C-alpha cells in the first residue's frame, strides 16, 4: 500500500495505480491545526476530494486530518537538550495530542462522520499523526520519529512496551540520507535537510570526507528502519497492524527520507526494507551496542509468518561466532516445531555467554521448512528459508560504558 501523504496528486498516478492493482491510502489535503471558522471549508474540501479521485478503485482508505496538533517532536536542539524549558515544551506538545481540543475533539469527529457519509464504501481514519486517546478506543499512526528527532531506534521496543497502543500503526519512521558526493564540513545545506537531526545522529564533522559521511547516513537509515520493522513484526496483532514509512522517493537530488533517490535508484534502505518485509522472517531481540567478556545475554527468538498455511517441521538454528573464534567457542542452538500461519511465534530463547575475546560478535539465525501448495506458489512443495544476522562488539571490561561513566563521576567528585 502507498500513502498519498497530505495531498492529492496528479491524475496519472491514480490511473497507474488502478492499472497495476496498487492499493492507496488517500489523505485529504488537511494538514495542521485549523480554527473553528473553517468548518464549511473543510466540508467543501472533503466533497471535492471524493468527487475528484473517489472513483478510482485503487483508493481503499481515506485519511482525514493529518497532524491536527502539530508534530509531537520537533527537530532536536542541542543547545536546549535537557533544559527544563525543553522538557516543558515536550509536555505541552503531548498535552495537545491527548487532551480535548477543537481540532481533536470536534473538527476530526466532523471529518470522520461527514467523509463516511460521502463515501460509505471505504473506511476512514479521521485523524493521523497523533497519540492515541487516553483511555479512549481511538488508535492512530503516531509519528514518534525515534532515532531521528528524539531517542534512538533501540528505544522502539521499550516505548511500545510502556504504551502498547503506540504500536497499532506507527508512522514517522525513517531518517534522511545524503546523496553520494564530496560534501563540505558545513553539510547538509539543501533546502529540506533536517540539519539538527543530522548533527545529533550522523554529524558531518565526525567523518574525514564527504563520501564517508554520505555512506554513513545510508547505513544509519538502514539501522533505524530495520529496528522499527522487526519490532513491529514481532508484535503482529498484539497490538500492531502495520506501519508507514515516511517517504518512498527523495524530493530533490541532494537527499531525503526516501528509499529511492530522486532519480528512482534504490538506496541500501530499499533492500533492507525488502528483506525485513519478506513473507517469513526470523527475529531476535537486539544485541547491545557493546558487550564484555563473561557477560550473559538471553535473547528471545521469534518467527513472523505472513503465510496463510503453517510451516510444519520447521528448524530454526542460532549460531554465535566471531571472525577469529576457535571452533570450541562457537555457540549453537536449535529449535524444531510448527510455525502457524499469519502469526508471530516465539520459538525459544538463546543464552549467549560472551567469551574472553575482543572484537565483533555475530548472532546468525536461519529458519528452514517447507510449505504445501498455496503458501508461496504453484508447485506441490516449497522450501522456505529465512536468515538474519545481528552484530555487536566485545570490548575489554574496563572500557565498558558503565565503567567509563563511573570513572567520569568519580573524577567529577574529586
Regions found by a protein language model. Give the residues of each.
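Short, surface-exposed loop/turn segments at beta-strand-coil junctions that are enriched for proline
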Residues: 306, 351-359
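Substrate-binding clefts and catalytic carboxylate motifs of secreted carbohydrate-active enzymes
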Residues: 62, 92-96, 106-107, 113-116, ...
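Active-site mouth of glycoside hydrolases
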Residues: 1-138, 243
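Extracellular Ig-like/FN3 beta-sandwich strand-entry sites
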Residues: 296, 313, 345, 358-362
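Extracellular and select intracellular beta-sandwich modules with Ser/Thr-enriched
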Residues: 314, 329-331, 346, 384-389
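Aromatic sugar-binding surface patches on proteins
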Residues: 340-350
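Short beta-strand elements
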Residues: 375-408
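Short, aromatic- and glycine-rich surface loops/edge beta-strands on solvent-exposed regions
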Residues: 359-380
Amino acid at each position: 500500500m502507498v500513502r498519498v501523504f497530505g495531498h492529492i496528486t496528479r491524475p496519472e498516478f491514480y490511473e497507474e495505480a488502478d492499472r497495476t492493482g496498487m492499493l492507496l491510502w488517500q489523505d485529504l489535503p488537511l494538514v495542521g491545526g485549523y480554527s473553528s471558522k473553517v468548518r464549511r471549508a473543510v466540508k467543501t474540501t472533503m466533497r471535492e476530494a471524493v468527487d475528484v479521485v473517489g472513483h478510482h478503485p485503487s483508493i481503499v482508505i481515506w485519511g482525514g486530518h493529518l497532524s491536527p496538533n502539530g508534530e509531537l517532536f520537533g527537530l532536536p536542539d542541542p543547545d536546549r537538550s535537557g533544559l527544563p524549558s525543553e522538557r516543558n515544551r515536550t509536555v505541552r506538545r503531548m498535552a495537545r495530542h491527548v487532551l480535548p481540543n477543537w481540532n481533536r475533539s470536534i473538527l476530526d469527529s466532523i471529518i470522520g462522520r461527514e467523509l463516511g457519509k460521502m463515501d460509505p464504501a471505504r473506511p476512514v481514519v479521521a485523524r493521523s499523526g497523533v497519540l492515541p486517546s487516553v483511555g479512549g478506543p481511538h488508535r492512530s499512526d503516531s509519528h514518534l520519529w525515534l532515532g531521528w528527532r528524539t531517542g534512538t531506534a533501540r528505544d522502539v521496543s521499550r516505548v511500545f512496551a510502556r504504551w502498547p497502543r503506540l504500536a497499532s500503526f506507527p508512522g514517522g519512521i525513517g531518517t534522511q540520507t545524503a546523496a553520494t558526493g564530496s560534501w563540505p564540513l558545513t553539510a547538509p545545506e539543501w533546502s529540506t535537510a533536517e540539519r539538527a537531526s543530522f548533527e545529533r545522529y550522523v554529524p558531518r564533522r565526525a567523518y574525514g570526507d564527504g563520501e564517508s559521511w554520505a555512506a554513513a547516513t545510508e547505513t544509519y537509515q538502514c539501522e533505524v528502519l530495520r529496528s522499527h520493522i522487526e519490532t513491529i513484526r514481532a508484535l503482529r496483532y498484539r497490538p500492531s497492524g502495520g506501519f508507514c514509512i515516511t517517504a518512498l522517493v527523495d524530493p530533490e537530488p541532494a537527499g531525503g527520507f526516501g528509499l529511492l533517490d530522486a532519480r528512482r535508484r534504490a538506496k541500501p534502505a530499499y533492500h533492507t526494507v525488502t528483506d525485513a518485509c519478506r513473507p517469513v522472517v526470523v527475529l531476535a531481540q537486539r544485541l547491545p551496542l557493546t558487550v564484555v567478556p563473561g557477560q550473559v545475554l538471553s535473547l528471545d527468538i521469534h518467527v513472523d509468518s505472513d503465510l496463510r498455511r503453517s510451516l510444519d517441521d520447521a528448524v530454526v538454528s542460532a549460531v554465535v561466532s566471531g571472525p577469529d573464534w576457535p571452533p570450541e567457542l562457537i555457540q549453537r542452538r536449535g529449535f524444531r516445531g510448527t510455525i502457524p500461519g499469519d502469526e508471530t511465534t516465539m520459538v525459544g530463547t538463546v543464552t549467549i555467554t560472551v567469551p574472553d575475546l575482543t572484537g565483533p560478535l555475530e548472532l546468525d539465525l536461519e529458519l528452514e521448512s517447507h510449505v504445501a501448495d498455496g503458501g508461496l506458489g504453484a508447485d506441490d512443495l516449497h522450501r522456505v528459508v529465512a536468515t538474519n544476522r545481528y552484530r555487536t562488539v566485545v570490548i575489554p571490561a574496563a572500557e565498558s560504558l558503565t565503567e567509563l561513566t563511573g570513572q567520569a563521576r568519580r573524577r567529577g567528585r574529586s
